[in-house]
């Protein structure tokens, strides 16, 4: 499978949740109101009017429509010192749903996400190597379970499916020991078309680590940062790039492909190793297996347990300097505000890796540039599937159809 991500334009100017009281803007202003509530939580109509610069009358009409459409819920009125009690409004979690599918090299994740962005159901399938037929069969089973769990009315509110997957599932064949037949099947397999045919739902696709970056951008620490590189460590390390609060995809949807970054000059007729060769979880998995331990422990709390920790520490010591080197090169080009690091591992491993990366950054020459601060990602292993689910939700309900536009609170 050679994934072709749905590349939305990044040229749109930055948008605040501010509406227009002119005619013909009903749908847009409804999206503005929904986004204001999404960003600010439980707020009153008066507060929505202040944030969006729409009139009180317009807000009253819009919120009535959204309440009638069951996209909003009224909460208990709050009495102030004077005047009528204010009625807080919140998003109705059952107002809409989306399905996120992460197809990885070692596992498959499927999430049912509600209108508030909360994960309602999850399924996981682990494997040694990704087989397209096995993956499609499991997705089909999970979608049937979702349809069974939701009433017919709620199933009609499913906005679509977002797929997060590597651009080239058959890549780095020798590194992972992939069977040539499996690689050939992936080259012929059209996952997006197969799932669309299976469900009849709209299907959107995005590179897996870019989808993870989407989740962090709109639901995590990225909401407070305008320019950052996002690093996600899984079987292979990868990433995403946010510039001026926009997710930057690049010409081929592959911006932020940190895993392919060379770690030095070619020499002796050999290519320099790439970052993914030395700073990926498959290396930690190999360490565990060599020590007679369970390789699957890379993604859970066992990696920080006494039995596993010496091997995890050795991997961190090997991994941190190359990541720091990648941050140096990225900063030279982009003048970064920060780096957000996350991955498919427990919080203890993430925290230790960040400390090691920060220490390794001190060993490089930063003269002429300002070193970025390294932050822990807030989403974790769900980031890729959650980012996939956010694709249809934001396409249908955000003020701008460009998902990759982060909205600021109007002041």
Question: Where in the sequence are the language-model features?
Answer:
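ATP-binding/phosphotransfer module of carbohydrate and carboxylate kinases, centering on a glycine-rich
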Residues: 1-75, 81-124, 130-154, 199, ...
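Short helix-capping/turn signature of helix-turn-helix
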Residues: 39-40, 219, 234
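Short clusters of small/polar residues that mark proteolytic maturation junctions
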Residues: 48, 77, 124, 180, ...
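Short glycine-aspartate micro-motif
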Residues: 98-102, 158-162, 228-232, 238-240
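Short, glycine/acidic-enriched loop or turn micro-motifs at the edges of active sites
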Residues: 105, 211, 235
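Glycine-rich phosphate-binding loop and adjoining helix at the ATP-binding site
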Residues: 119, 124-227, 352-363
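Short, active-site-adjacent cap segments at secondary-structure transitions
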Residues: 168-171, 211-213, 238-239, 248, ...
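Glycine-rich phosphate-binding loop of actin/hexokinase-like ATP-binding domains
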Residues: 225-279
């Amino acid at each position: 499978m050679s994934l072709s991500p749905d590349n939305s334009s990044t040229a749109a100017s930055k948008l605040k949740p501010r509406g227009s009281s002119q005619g013909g803007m009903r749908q847009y202003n409804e999206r503005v109101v929904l986004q204001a509530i999404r960003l600010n939580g439980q707020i009153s109509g008066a507060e929505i009017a202040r944030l969006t610069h729409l009139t009180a009358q317009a807000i009253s009409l819009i919120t009535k429509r959204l309440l009638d459409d069951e996209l909003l819920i009224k909460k208990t009125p709050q009495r102030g010192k004077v005047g009528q009690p204010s009625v807080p409004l919140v998003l109705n979690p059952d107002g809409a749903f989306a399905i996120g599918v992460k197809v990885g090299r070692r596992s498959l994740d499927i999430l049912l996400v509600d209108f508030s962005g909360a994960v309602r159901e999850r399924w996981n399938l682990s494997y040694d190597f990704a087989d397209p037929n096995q993956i499609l069969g499991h997705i089909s089973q999970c979608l049937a379970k979702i349809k069974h769990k939701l009433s017919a009315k709620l199933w009609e509110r499913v906005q679509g499916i977002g797929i997060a997957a590597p651009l080239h599932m058959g890549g780095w064949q020798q590194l992972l020991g992939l069977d040539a037949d499996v690689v050939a099947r992936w080259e012929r397999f059209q996952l997006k078309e197969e799932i669309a045919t299976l469900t009849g739902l709209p299907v959107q696709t995005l590179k897996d680590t870019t989808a993870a970056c989407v989740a962090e951008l709109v639901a995590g620490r990225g909401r407070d940062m305008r320019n950052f590189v996002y690093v996600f460590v899984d079987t292979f390390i990868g990433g995403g790039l946010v510039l001026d609060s926009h997710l930057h995809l690049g010409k081929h949807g592959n911006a932020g492909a940190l895993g392919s970054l060379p770690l030095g000059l070619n020499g002796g007729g050999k290519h320099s190793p790439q970052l993914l060769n030395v700073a990926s979880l498959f290396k930690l998995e190999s360490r565990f297996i060599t020590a007679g331990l369970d390789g699957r422990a890379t993604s859970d709390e066992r990696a920080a347990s006494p039995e596993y920790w010496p091997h995890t520490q050795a991997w961190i010591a090997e991994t941190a300097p190359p990541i720091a080197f990648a941050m140096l090169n990225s900063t030279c080009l982009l003048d970064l505000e920060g780096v957000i690091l996350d991955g498919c591992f427990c919080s203890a491993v993430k925290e230790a890796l960040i400390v090691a990366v920060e220490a390794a950054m001190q060993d490089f020459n930063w003269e002429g540039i300002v070193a970025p601060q390294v932050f822990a990602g807030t989403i974790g292993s769900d980031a890729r599937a959650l980012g996939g689910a956010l694709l249809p939700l934001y396409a249908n309900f955000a003020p701008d159809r460009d998902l990759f536009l982060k909205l600021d609170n109007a002041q």
